[in-house]
A protein has these predicted regions:
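Short secondary-structure capping/turn segments at boundaries of alpha-helices and beta-strands
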Residues: 14-17, 57
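Extreme N-terminal targeting and regulatory segments of eukaryotic proteins
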Residues: 46, 50-55, 66-73, 79, ...
Length: 211
């Protein structure tokens, strides 16, 4: 599971529509795009699906081409090998001038499994001890499983049994995004790490392994 609390600014690409939830409550839904430039100079235009309180009347305000800022809970998952970002907000969405910069910033809550490569300890250029590792979250798509990878950097190294290859962890930290060869890369600057105690459903999902 990858859940983030974020604020994002971008341009609406598909005008808002009124929809109805399973509970019979009305809400509006639209998509927006936020471009990211990677360290390698490549660019990724990332689309974000946004859902917010509203109805057909308020949906008319959110037309394609308008620049907006929205804050809420962002869910990240894979489907058919593509990364999807879905934002749910309960707060007012701001309309912005064209000069307002694109952005997507916030915090990440991650639950998943550390890769078989385990933990890498190293020193920064200034000689400060650090750690890096990769971990994945799995989502079931029909009969198949999809895996979303996150790269973590830990500035306060931990040497515990639960922080090792193939261990399940819950990580909280700052969401960081990069682009490599035109593909979005998920990164996180760690604030806290703890062992993840799986329930039966989560365990069934987590036991699946990426090829």
């Amino acid at each position: 599971m990858i859940k983030c609390n974020v604020t994002t600014c971008g341009v609406i690409t598909s005008s808002a529509e009124e929809k109805t939830s399973k509970e019979g409550e009305k809400f509006i839904s639209f998509s927006m795009v936020v471009p990211f430039e990677g360290k390698d100079g490549t660019v990724k235009e990332q689309y974000i699906s946004v859902s917010a309180p509203g109805d057909a009347q308020s949906a008319a305000n959110y037309s394609a081409g308008r620049r907006v800022t929205a804050s809420g809970v962002l869910y990240i998952r894979k489907h058919d090998s593509s990364t999807y970002l879905n934002l749910r907000t309960d707060t007012n969405i701001e309309f912005n001038e064209s000069t307002t910069p694109d952005r997507l910033v916030g915090s990440m809550e991650f639950k998943g499994k550390i890769s078989k490569k385990g933990i890498k300890d190293f020193n920064s250029k200034k000689g400060k001890p650090m750690q890096s590792f990769s971990a994945f979250s799995s989502d079931k798509n029909g009969e198949n499983y999809e895996f979303t990878w996150v790269s973590f950097i830990n500035l306060s190294p931990i040497h515990e049994e639960y922080l090792a290859a193939d261990k399940y962890v819950e990580v909280h930290g700052d969401l960081q995004l990069d682009v490599f060869k035109g593909e979005l890369q998920l990164e996180c600057k760690v604030k806290s790490i703890a062992p993840w105690e799986l329930n039966k459903t989560a365990e069934a999902n987590a036991e699946q392994q990426p090829s």
